[in-house]
């Protein structure tokens, strides 16, 4: 567990420090090869859906909002998620981002690609599809191979877990940003509606 947490911290720090293309519809991902890969993608998919739902809920005029100078804006936080998806998958599996993405290993530049809500959604969707395709192709034998991620040696397994942690970290950041702008996460609304319905059913 300590190694996994350490890997997540390394990914988060490295992606913050590492010094408009057309986005074609990605091909459907093949079924994952092993139980770990399937379980990881299941957890990842939940955070992925919440990220896309939240991005959709935030109005365009809030995408350049940031909590303080020098801190990522709403748009930049979403773009940084996509950056992490492409960068970590490249190191973990060797799978390069599609050429049409125009990926650069430069988060400061990538995170400022655009402020357009619709384009950011396409960028996120393409990066999520890339993650699914890459992890789905990883064999069980590959999981224990050692890769070098920003100067740190770790297994492919730990690197992929850290990737999921990176998504959840910035989903949490995006939730805080949304609430600061009076936007309630869609799944939170659904949970409250379900609770009210359940309470109504219990009343005599």
Regions found by a protein language model. Give the residues of each.
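Short, contiguous alpha-helical
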Residues: 41-45, 52, 62-105, 148-204
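Bacterial N-terminal signal peptides
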Residues: 8-20
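Positively charged n-region of N-terminal signal peptides that target proteins for export
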Residues: 1-6
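Short, low-complexity N-terminal intrinsically disordered segments enriched in polar/charged residues
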Residues: 28-41
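Membrane-proximal, proline-rich intrinsically disordered regions
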Residues: 58-59
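Acidic/histidine-rich alpha-helical segments that form the ligand environment
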Residues: 109-147, 155-169
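Boundary at the C-terminal end of the N-terminal hydrophobic targeting segment
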Residues: 20-29
